Amino acid sequence: MATRNPFDIDHKSKYLREAALEANLSHPETTPTMLTCPIDSGFLKDPVITPEGFVYNKSSILKWLETKKEDPQSRKPLTAKDLQPFPELLIIVNRFVETQTNYEKLKNRLVQNARVAARQKEYTEIPDIFLCPISKTLIKTPVITAQGKVYDQEALSNFLIATGNKDETGKKLSIDDVVVFDELYQQIKVYNFYRKREVQKNQIQPSVSNGFGFFSLNFLTSWLWGTEEKKEKTSSDMTY
């Protein structure tokens, strides 16, 4: 039977503190390294900890040890008996996964609303979903916070510099706390396309109407003139 490493508890406590800190600071679109297995790259589901404080999914490390009798990271000798269950870590993992799930739901709703706004019938006013809450203008490069708030990247960056990393409500926020919202960017491109086309349509329509009226009048005059010429020619060619 393997002797329990006296530092196991200390390793666990340290790992839990650092994992919780990383999870709290991580954007939901990222994956905290301390909550994932270094072997399979997936979230820790059945975590075990080694005497040196490295954490793995039990199934992955056991499979590794079938062919290699060493720790994947330290390269020091390691056996299955050296592994200690680490269920306490699952509280942090599950909490982050839940945060990720809620964030994705919120983000999907934003994208759905943006799709509708991008294809509206009238383009007289910019939809609120495409307006930056700071600059009050159309967003060029959208970025999103962990809470689902959207800004224009340049406007937010300048604002945070001026306020010492505080958002418009006074809460702490840095440019590192946001990620580019590409799905919204694509809908803004669609909106700009339709808005530009609508503007061009409104500008061209009067000219086309005037041009068509002029063309119709000329065509009618020419047709009538040609008809009269044909009548006269026919009359002159007739013999009595």
Curated annotation (Swiss-Prot):
Ubiquitinated in the presence of host E1 ubiquitin-activating enzyme, E2 ubiquitin-conjugating enzyme and ubiquitin. It catalyses: S-ubiquitinyl-[E2 ubiquitin-conjugating enzyme]-L-cysteine + [acceptor protein]-L-lysine = [E2 ubiquitin-conjugating enzyme]-L-cysteine + N(6)-ubiquitinyl-[acceptor protein]-L-lysine. U-box 1 is critical to the ubiquitin ligase activity, and U-box 2 mediates interaction with host target. GO terms for cellular component: cytoplasm; extracellular region; host cell. One of its GO terms (biological process) is protein ubiquitination. It holds the Pfam family U-box. Its main location: secreted. This is E3 ubiquitin-protein ligase LubX. SMART domains: Ubox (SM00504). PANTHER family: E3 UBIQUITIN-PROTEIN LIGASE CHIP. Residues 30-103, 125-198 form the U-box domain. Its EC number is 2.3.2.27. CDD domains: RING-Ubox (cd16453), RING-Ubox_LubX-like_rpt1 (cd23149). InterPro entries: Ubox_domain, Znf_RING/FYVE/PHD. It is found in: Secreted; Host cell. It comes from Legionella pneumophila (strain Paris). Effector proteins function to alter host cell physiology and promote bacterial survival in host tissues. This protein is an E3 ubiquitin ligase that interferes with host's ubiquitination pathway. GO terms for molecular function: protein-folding chaperone binding; ubiquitin protein ligase activity; ubiquitin-protein transferase activity. Keywords: Repeat, Secreted, Transferase, Ubl conjugation, Ubl conjugation pathway, Virulence.
